[in-house]
From Swiss-Prot:
Family: Belongs to the glucose-6-phosphate dehydrogenase family.
UniProt catalytic activity: D-glucose 6-phosphate + NADP(+) = 6-phospho-D-glucono-1,5-lactone + NADPH + H(+)
Binding-site residues for substrate, renumbered to this chain: 171, 175, 209, 228, 319, 324
Protein name: Glucose-6-phosphate 1-dehydrogenase 1
PANTHER family found in the cross-reference section: GLUCOSE-6-PHOSPHATE 1-DEHYDROGENASE (PTHR23429:SF0), GLUCOSE-6-PHOSPHATE 1-DEHYDROGENASE G6PD (PTHR23429)
Function text: Catalyzes the oxidation of glucose 6-phosphate to 6-phosphogluconolactone.
GO biological process: one example: pentose-phosphate shunt, oxidative branch
Active site: 233 (proton acceptor)
């Protein structure tokens, strides 16, 4: 096993290049990297579909054209990088052919856009033909389906790869506001001074989707909301919101601080979790008629460390809700009643809102007094307006993988810790509550916040209805 440290990749090998992820995300990201002149290596696609390179190029153009206005010169440069290998990834002969095609490439990036059950077999086959020396391997979530399977997967990968050769892809870590979180927190004294238990009374994280499982019924029914978005996306976001400042600029410096947050979190309590399922879910193709899989989950947790002790954290995620929005909302502590006002009713607590998606931005909600009453005043910033066009998550992650930047990828210990945190909810899932499509989930979710701020209407982009 050879160190897979720094240095840019000189070949990108995409396993599953004819799959759904490539069609929706990967080709678009590659095109945008090519447009920005950030792509500098050949691309070899591997899949079971029997097609020519010309057919792959045509399929890539159709995939990109769904969302991008294509510049022919840019696409022609991208097309010139493409080659294709047809075969079964479980067949050892495929890897002999792959070794011949790779030739003199010395630092390939293998991007595994494949079902998780194939991650370890593919990597082990690559090791058998000595194709892992100085290579990096990117694997898409989910990383296991519980703590035991995550431990097993990590053990099999680590048997043939160093930790610095493994890139665990979670596209949420490539979203602009998530990337910017540590800079927002620690580069701005006005925020840094407020960011602890002395000023923050509670934290809410919402990930709402206004659509159902669509054509992913069979996949989703074996996963559910907790595995699909909470164990990975939302706990990673929570760590970035609550971690201490990294002591240096390396990926390990950042991941060390995230891991500290996870270690300070107790396993989730099933009595502080509400699971829901939207009406009509069991009629979706691929979903069991008696399914108890959750399409909505709300939970309460805490971080038992000096900065956050005693601050409740509420997380909710669901499908078929009124809007598509992901946000983090921090409530500041209420100020005392103001004796110099005729009406001594205290102002509503200030709020800091970070909208991750759509139209990323930050809002500071403050109070103003007019006509003997309090009014909320919103100070809003749109990152697209103030910082320019954002880099798309997969574009950012692909580039980071190609140049060997590990900052945007999850580390082994964090994956295992987040599975440890959610494991009690997998072992004791509890009752499933039905809810109407277009609602904010089951009524039972309100009970989690008894004695605290209720679930807030999310901050939506201007002109968006919910």
């Amino acid at each position: 096993m050879v160190d897979g440290g720094g240095g840019a990749s000189d070949l990108l090998v995409i396993f599953g290049i004819t799959g759904d992820l490539a069609r929706k995300m990967t080709f678009r990201a590659l095109y945008r990297l090519e447009r920005h002149q950030l792509l500098d290596c050949p691309i070899l696609g591997v899949a079971s579909d029997d097609m020519s390179v010309g057919q792959l190029v045509k399929w890539a153009r159709e995939s990109i054209g769904r969302t991008e206005k294509i510049d022919d010169a840019v696409f022609d440069r991208l097309a010139g990088r493409l080659s294709y290998l047809h075969g079964d990834v479980t067949d050892s002969q495929l890897y002999d052919s792959l070794a011949e095609l790779i030739g003199s490439a010395c630092r390939p990036l293998y991007y595994l856009e494949m079902p998780p059950a194939l991650f370890a077999p593919i990597v082990e086959n690559l090791a058998n033909v000595r194709l892992l020396e100085r290579a990096r391997v990117a694997v898409e979530k989910p990383f296991g389906h519980d703590l035991a399977s995550a431990l097993e997967l990590n053990a099999r990968l680590r048997a043939v790869l160093g930790e610095d050769q493994i890139l665990r892809v979670d596209h949420f870590l490539g979203k602009q506001p998530v990337v910017e979180l540590e800079y927002l927190r620690f580069a701005n004294q006005a925020l840094a001074e407020l960011w602890d238990r002395n000023s923050i009374s509670e934290i809410h994280i919402t990930m709402a989707e206004d659509f159902g499982v669509e054509d992913r019924g069979k996949f989703y029914d074996a996963v559910g909301a907790l595995r699909d978005v909470v164990q990975n996306h939302l706990l990673q976001v929570l760590a970035l919101v609550t971690m201490e400042p990294p002591v240096g600029s390396s990926a390990d410096d950042l991941n060390d601080k995230k891991a500290e947050v996870f270690r300070a979190m107790a396993p989730l309590d099933p009595d502080r979790c509400v699971r829901g399922q939207y009406l009509g879910y069991t009629e979706v193709a691929g979903v069991a008629s008696d399914s108890a899989t959750e399409t909505y989950v709300a939970l309460r947790t805490e971080i038992d460390n000096w900065r956050w002790a005693g601050v409740p954290i509420f997380v909710r995620a669901g499908k078929e809700l009124p809007a598509k929005v992901t946000e983090v909302r921090l409530f500041l502590r209420r100020v005392p009643a103001l004796a110099f006002l005729p009406n001594r009713r205290p102002a509503e607590p200030n709020q800091i809102v970070l909208r991750i998606d759509p139209d990323p931005g930050m809002r500071l909600q403050i109070s103003a007094h007019t006509d003997d009453s309090w009014r909320d005043i919103h100070l809003d910033s749109s990152f697209a307006v103030d910082l320019g066009e954002p880099i798309r998550p997969y574009e950012r992650l692909l580039y980071a993988g190609l140049v060997g930047d590990h900052q945007l990828f999850a580390r082994e210990d964090s994956i295992e810790q987040t599975w440890r945190i959610v494991q009690p909810l997998l072992d004791n899932p509890g009752e499933i509550h039905r809810y109407d499509r277009g609602s904010w989930g089951p009524e039972a979710a309100q009970s989690l916040l008894r004695g605290h701020r209720g679930w807030q209407s999310p901050w939506l982009p201007r002109g968006t209805d919910a």
